[in-house]
């Protein structure tokens, strides 16, 4: 395996050494099942590059 591939996988998943479980860092798209990307600017949102689904983040009001 190349070094670039190993580094890329570490960006997608997180390993918990205490429990021995692997979990995904980003959300999963409800329409197609692929990873979603988080964008901060101009408005915070989750976007799927595969199908184009977008979820806007709402701030909690105090």
UniProtKB/Swiss-Prot annotation:
Binds 1 zinc ion per subunit. GO terms for biological process: translation. Pfam families: Ribosomal_S27. Signal peptide: none annotated. GO terms for cellular component: ribonucleoprotein complex; ribosome. This is Small ribosomal subunit protein eS31. It comes from the Archaea. Part of the 30S ribosomal subunit. The gene is rps27ae. Its cofactor is Zn(2+). A zinc finger (C4-type) spans 29-51. Disulfide bonds: none annotated. NCBIfam families: PRK00432.1 (NF001669). GO terms for molecular function: structural constituent of ribosome; zinc ion binding. Zn(2+) binds at residues 29, 32, 48, 51. Keywords: Metal-binding, Ribonucleoprotein, Ribosomal protein, Zinc, Zinc-finger. Belongs to the eukaryotic ribosomal protein eS31 family.
